[in-house]
Amino acid sequence: MNIPRQLSTFVIGLFFCGAVYGASYPLKVSSANPRILVDQNNVPFLVVGDSPHSLWVNLTSAESAAYLANRAAHGVNSLWVNLVIIRPVEGRPDCSLVDGTKPFTNTISGTRSYDLTTPNEAYFAHVDEVMRMAETNGILVMIDPLETAGFLRTALQNGSTRCRAYGQFLGNRYKNFPNIIWQHGNDFQAWSVATNDAVITAVALGIKDNDSNHLHTIELNYQASSSLDDPNWAPIVGLNLAYTYYATYAEVLHAYNQSASIPVFMGEANYEYDKQQNEDGGSPRILRMQEYWTMLCGATGQLYGNKYTWRFLPGWQNYLDSPGVVQLGYMANLFRTRKWYNLVPDQTHVFVTAGYGKFVSSGPPASAPGGRFAGNDYVTAALTPDGTLGMAYLPQGGTITVAMSKLQKPITARWFDPSGNTFRAIAGSPFANTGKHRFTPPRKNSAGDPDWVLVLEAGAGP
């Protein structure tokens, strides 16, 4: 028994005061503000997610229950899970569960690919069980029904007719599970090839044939993309998934500006402890940068990821309470206790008028919107239309100039330390809402890094 871990989880649960926030699923796009997701009671839903891709295939039921309870205690309300997995780094060559149960009972004649029209009841019964555990913990599951990094070949060998039938099976089976969003794709590099797109679209359309209750989205290609880059998915998706391993502000704003009628969220960026070639990796500081950039560029939330828990590598339990997920919780609490859903990105710098750094539109390499993280000093800022809340994230410290007339008085100004979950008062606060004011954060936060969040709000604030 790991007493320190149990204690930390208990404290986290107290800190978040009911981290699941009682969302009434299924989610929908807000009719009043299509930039955000809401639950069935029209309560704004901030996506605070993890990415345990191999949850169903690599954990037992008991391990799944422990993992889900831990994530709920950390304030996580959403998970990305792949329904079937073939790649050895995530699952097993035959895609089986830990007990050897395979997802399908037959293969396509003359191939090694599963026949998608022959689902194995025992496999999907396990999926059902874990889905109910997630619901008990108040957690939304973003199900990838046929992840394209490993199963595109299988989809092509099945063809569109079988793929649609598979989707119909899923739609019928899961239409009454409230806590679902259907998330297609996954490193879908070749989506622009019509035959590839057609079979994955067929799965989605099959689901929609029997399930009109749940939203759909799709992850396209790395290193940077959004769902709406593929026009064939525009009639299907109700949520625009931004994907980038570069500074997130560029891709999130790209997705935000593609459509005012559906929300955007960051579906994948750098994972904690992970670093691939030509990527910056997932240190706590980089995770904070991508998270706060994302939130102040108009997103309805984001998914975190962890090298040890997306694959469930040996010893994954030792990484459940990592700095990255703890600081993700700090971020979530900062926004959840404020009207984050009314924030509008300050793209034209009428709010933060100077000191906002350089917006890196590309590279190096040239295909990298946002560029690398090291030295990236772009300040993302957002403001509510009524002027009751303004926020800015300063990744490298420095001094910014704020147009105080955009805010309502009296203006309480504080610095939030995103690494330590503490506020620091600013001399002279509260301020009048006239003229401009220069704000300079303390030199270093509690982690010894230069990033801070400026929080300006009418009255005393939460």
Language-model features: locations:
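Boundary/junction segments of secreted and surface-exposed precursor proteins
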Residues: G22-V29
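Active-site mouth of glycoside hydrolases
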Residues: S30-A250
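A generic structural motif
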Residues: S51, S429-P430
